[in-house]
C-alpha cells in the first residue's frame, strides 16, 4: 500500500503532501507562498493542483478528521508512557482514536487508504479477518490444508513448506519459468536465470500483481522504476506455449529413473552387513534408469516410427508439433479455442497442415522459416526497417582483416563498404544474411509490415501508409512507424 504520514500539533492534523491527495476534498484554502490560492476550500484536488502544490514547495496541508475517512493505521499506535496499544495495525482511523493520540501526546502516525490504492481493500480485509498472527501458526495451517489427515507439528510443517518452494531437489523454477516471470514483472529478461528457487521478493511481486489486476490495466511504473504491463493472459498465445523437445522429455524420465535407483541404493545400504568391504557393484543397480529410458522410447505416447517413405516425408515428420502426450492435452478434453488458428501462429505454425478428425488443431507443423529457441519458444524471422528504409543485416562469419568480430550483426551496406576500403593483400570479412528472429511476445512490442510492401532500389518504402500489424491486430501505419518487415 501507499503510505501517508499525518502530523499532529496543537490538536490539529497536517497531511504530508503525497499523490494520495489527488481526488480528495480540502477543508480549507490551500495557499502558496506568494499568497495565491491553489485550491479553494471544499474543492477536489486534481492532478494539476497537486503539481502546483509541489511546485510551490507545499509539504503539508491542514486537514480535518472527516478528510481521513477510509484511512487505516499502518502499525500499532502505542502510548509510550504506559505501553497501552491505542489502536492496532490495520484498524480504521476514527475521531476517538485521534482524540486518544492527542491525549497521549503522540505527534505523528502512518496511514493508508485501501479503497483508493490500486491494490484494493482485499489485502487489508484479509489480514483483519485472519485469526493467525504468527509465522509458526501460518505454517501449521498450511500443513493442515495440504495434508488434511495428518496431525500437524511445527517441524513437519516447516519441512513441507521448505520442500515446496525452497529445496532445489524438490522444486525447480526452471530457466524458462524465470524468463517468463522476469518478463511479466518488468525485470531484465536474463536476470537470475540459473536460480531454481523463489525469493521473498518474487512472492511479493506475484501477490502485488494479482491484487492490482482488478483495478489496473495497461502499463504502470513501480516504485523501483520497473514498467509492468497488467493484462489477462491468453493461454493460446504462443508466448505462453512452448515446445518441449525430446531431450527435455527424456531428461524428466531419466530423473525418475535416478530417483528410483537412489531409493534402491539406500535400501541396500541399510540392510548390507559388510559396508566396510562393500563394492559399488554390490549396491548399485542401473536397471531402474535403463528401464525408464527404454520405457520412454518404447511405449511413450509420443514415440513413433519415423516416416521414411522419402526424404521429404522424413523432414516433415521431424518438424511435426503435438499438443498431446504426457503433460499435454487429450483429444476428448481439448476445446475449440486450443485447436483454432491464433494470430501468433503467423510465421511460426502452418495454419493449413493439420490432420482431419479428432486430432485437428492438436497436431501441426512448423512454418518454413520458423525455429525453436533455447527456451522452447517458436521464433519467426524479420527484416529491420529504420526510418522507413529496409536495411538487410549480415552476420560476420570470418572477420578477416576488418575490425569486426565473429558473430557481429552489421548492415550489409556497411560490411560491403568496409571490405571495399581494405587495401591490397588484405583479407575481406565473410558473412551470411542475418534475419532478426523474434518470439511471439517480442513481436507484440513492434509494428511489423507485410513482406509485399513496395520498396525502391535503395530499400525506401514507397507508400506513405502501409499495411502492418501490431500485437496481432492489422493496422495502417506510416512508413516511419514500421520497425520490422516479414521475410
Task: List PLM regions with ranges.
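Intrinsically disordered, low-complexity regulatory segments
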Residues: 1-487
Amino acid at each position: 500500500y501507499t503510505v501517508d504520514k499525518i502530523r499532529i500539533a496543537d490538536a490539529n492534523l497536517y497531511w504530508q503532501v503525497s499523490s494520495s491527495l489527488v481526488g480528495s476534498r480540502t477543508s480549507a484554502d490551500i495557499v502558496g507562498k506568494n499568497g495565491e490560492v491553489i485550491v479553494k476550500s471544499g474543492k477536489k484536488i486534481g492532478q494539476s493542483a497537486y503539481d502546483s502544490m509541489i511546485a510551490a514547495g507545499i509539504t503539508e496541508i491542514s486537514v480535518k478528521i472527516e478528510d481521513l475517512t477510509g484511512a487505516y493505521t499502518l502499525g500499532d499506535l502505542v502510548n509510550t508512557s504506559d505501553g497501552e496499544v491505542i489502536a492496532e495495525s490495520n484498524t480504521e482511523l476514527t475521531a476517538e482514536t485521534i482524540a486518544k493520540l492527542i491525549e497521549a501526546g503522540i505527534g505523528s502516525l502512518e496511514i493508508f487508504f485501501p479503497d483508493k490504492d490500486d491494490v484494493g481493500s482485499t489485502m487489508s480485509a484479509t489480514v483483519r479477518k485472519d485469526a493467525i498472527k504468527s509465522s509458526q501458526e501460518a505454517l501449521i495451517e498450511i500443513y493442515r490444508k495440504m495434508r488434511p489427515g495428518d496431525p500437524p507439528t511445527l517441524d513437519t510443517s516447516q519441512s513441507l513448506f521448505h520442500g515446496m518452494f525452497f529445496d532445489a531437489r524438490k522444486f525447480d523454477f526452471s530457466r524458462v519459468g524465470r524468463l517468463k516471470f522476469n518478463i511479466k514483472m518488468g525485470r531484465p529478461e536474463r536476470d537470475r536465470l540459473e536460480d531454481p528457487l523463489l525469493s521473498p521478493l518474487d512472492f511479493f511481486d506475484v501477490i502485488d500483481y494479482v491484487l492490482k489486476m482488478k483495478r489496473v490495466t495497461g502499463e504502470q511504473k513501480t516504485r523501483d522504476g520497473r514498467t509492468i504491463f497488467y493484462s489477462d493472459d491468453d493461454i493460446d498465445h504462443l508466448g505462453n506455449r512452448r515446445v518441449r523437445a525430446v531431450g527435455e522429455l527424456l531428461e524428466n524420465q531419466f530423473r525418475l529413473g535416478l530417483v528410483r535407483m537412489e531409493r534402491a541404493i539406500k535400501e541396500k545400504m541399510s540392510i548390507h552387513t559388510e559396508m566396510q568391504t562393500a563394492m559399488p557393484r554390490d549396491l548399485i543397480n542401473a536397471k531402474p534408469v535403463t528401464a525408464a529410458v527404454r520405457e520412454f522410447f518404447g511405449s511413450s505416447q509420443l514415440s513413433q516410427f519415423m516416416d521414411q517413405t522419402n526424404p521429404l516425408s522424413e523432414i516433415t515428420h521431424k518438424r511435426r508439433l503435438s499438443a498431446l502426450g504426457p503433460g499435454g492435452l487429450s483429444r476428448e478434453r481439448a476445446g475449440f479455442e486450443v485447436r483454432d488458428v491464433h494470430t501468433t501462429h503467423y510465421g511460426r505454425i502452418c495454419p493449413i497442415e493439420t490432420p482431419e478428425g479428432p486430432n485437428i488443431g492438436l497436431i501441426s507443423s512448423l512454418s518454413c522459416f520458423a525455429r525453436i529457441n533455447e527456451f522452447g519458444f517458436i521464433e519467426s524471422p524479420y527484416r529491420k526497417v529504420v526510418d522507413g528504409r529496409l536495411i538487410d543485416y549480415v552476420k560476420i562469419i570470418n572477420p578477416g582483416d576488418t575490425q569486426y568480430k565473429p558473430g557481429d550483426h552489421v548492415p550489409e551496406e556497411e560490411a560491403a563498404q568496409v571490405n571495399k576500403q581494405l587495401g591490397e593483400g588484405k583479407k575481406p570479412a565473410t558473412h551470411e544474411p542475418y534475419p532478426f528472429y523474434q518470439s511471439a511476445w517480442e513481436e507484440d512490442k513492434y509494428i511489423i509490415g507485410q513482406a509485399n510492401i513496395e520498396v525502391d532500389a535503395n530499400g525506401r518504402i514507397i507508400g506513405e501508409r502501409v499495411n502492418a500489424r501490431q500485437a496481432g491486430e492489422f493496422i495502417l501505419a506510416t512508413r516511419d512507424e514500421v520497425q520490422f518487415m516479414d521475410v
